[in-house]
Amino acid sequence: MSRLFQKEDDIVALATPFFSSALCVIRSSGVSAIEKFSTMFSDPSKLLEASGHTIHYGYILDNETKEKLDEVVVCLYRAPKSFTGQDSIEVMAHGSLIGIRRIIDFFLKVGFRMAEPGEFTLRSFLAGKLDLTKAEAINELISAKTRQVHALAVNKLSGSLFDKIDLIKKDILNFLSAISVYLDYETDDNEVVIPVDIILKSKSELERLIDSYDTARKLENGVTLVLAGSVNVGKSSLFNLLLKEDRAIVSSYAGTTRDYIQASFEFDGILFNVFDTAGLRETSDFVEQLGIVRSNSLIKEASLIFYVVDLSGKLTDDDLKFIDAYKEDSRVLFVLNKVDLEQNNQTVEFFNSNDIVSLNTVKISTKTLFGINSLYDRIRSFIAVDYMKTSDYDIVISSTRQAALLKRAYALIIELLSKIEQNISYDMLAFDVYEVVNVLGEITGEVTSDDVLNNMFKNFCLGK
């Protein structure tokens, strides 16, 4: 059996990142956590006699040499009023790397073992302190990279998803109660009125939750934005402008960027993974050729493409090929750069021509910042279509596990409706209803297995 389920063990882990900092938090829990920790605290009797939810100042001591390891503040919790439902100690110490190692070594020396990833949260779940939807929300909250994802995780942590699943489950059980009447009493089938509206409502609620999953995945993965174009048109300048920092080398020499550069930024609460790619051109340089191949591959996979054109120069053959290939692609915005310079008449006339005027374009100058607000407005228009739909949903599903179970429950509901149309016997309908309820119970953790829990919590970070 996995050590995750050895609930009687006293466990310890660093709950904050392992790097030098002003403070760190070392978390411990277990049936003997307070007694064991007291042997390494400067005033053991104070801890042993203390009530829960109290804070104590003192020192971590080597219980053999009495050497002081660190000056600490200790938060003490007594079962069952703690996150794990067990006695727990949280130590706030100085964030010295050597100090952290020495303190944890002493925890191990007095009988604690290192916690497995997610073990504290698992113990909280097993103690009935939270359901699986809240446990997963904690993990989502920790890993959130943008305000939108963070807000969605907080919403689920407050119990919104559990409440929604519980409501659907109660509706389905009400349907079961209604058809149970016909199981208990003989009734003329012609007089039977099955409350199909209850099942249709549940079907609609499940559809809505399942639909929200695609939006959630897009929010978590972010927008893949590729900056493409010929050499020396200002892609790297635009890259730096979007990031608001100098990440890419800007040079008047063509071919400065020979491979892509990747970075991330947040815009209106949405994560953008932006790629500054090698300029598209014919070249004999093998390394640059590889960079161009990668550029073309990124373009094909991109969510959004900014094709940068130099309005002060002539359009290249590569520009014309790209425009012809992507002129009807809604992912592409043609960014007409360098409007601060004397413009090339042929290039300007090309984009003003009737054949090409329908192209999605915006004029900017990365040097003077002309048109940048217009560019930002175009970005907002793009993300409004697929990435700002969270307002359409009261709850958004982002867990692959939850989405898979919701799809199973939905398939069972469809099957149930089909059997109702076929006038299948009530006892068979009751069996199907119980199956739906069990699947919904797997989402919240009311029905689950050790294997499922082990697989889920191993993806948590240490100390959580």
From Swiss-Prot:
What is the annotated quaternary arrangement, including any partners? Homodimer. Heterotetramer of two MnmE and two MnmG subunits.
Question: What is one term from the GO cellular component aspect held by the record?
Answer: cytosol
Q: Where are the transmembrane segments?
A: none
The answer to whether keyword Transmembrane helix applies is no
Q: What family does this chain come from, according to its entry?
A: Belongs to the TRAFAC class TrmE-Era-EngA-EngB-Septin-like GTPase superfamily. TrmE GTPase family.
Which E.C. number(s) belong to this protein? 3.6.-.-
* Main location group: cytoplasm
Q: What's the record's note on cofactor binding? A: Binds 1 potassium ion per subunit.
Q: Which UniProt keywords apply?
A: Cytoplasm, GTP-binding, Hydrolase, Magnesium, Metal-binding, Nucleotide-binding, Potassium, tRNA processing
Residues engaged in binding GTP: 232-237, 251-257, 276-279
GO molecular function: any one? GTP binding
- Please state what the protein is called: tRNA modification GTPase MnmE
Q: Identify the Gene3D superfamilies for this entry.
A: P-loop containing nucleotide triphosphate hydrolases, Probable tRNA modification gtpase trme, domain 1, tRNA modification GTPase MnmE domain 2
CDD domains documented for this protein: trmE, TrmE_N
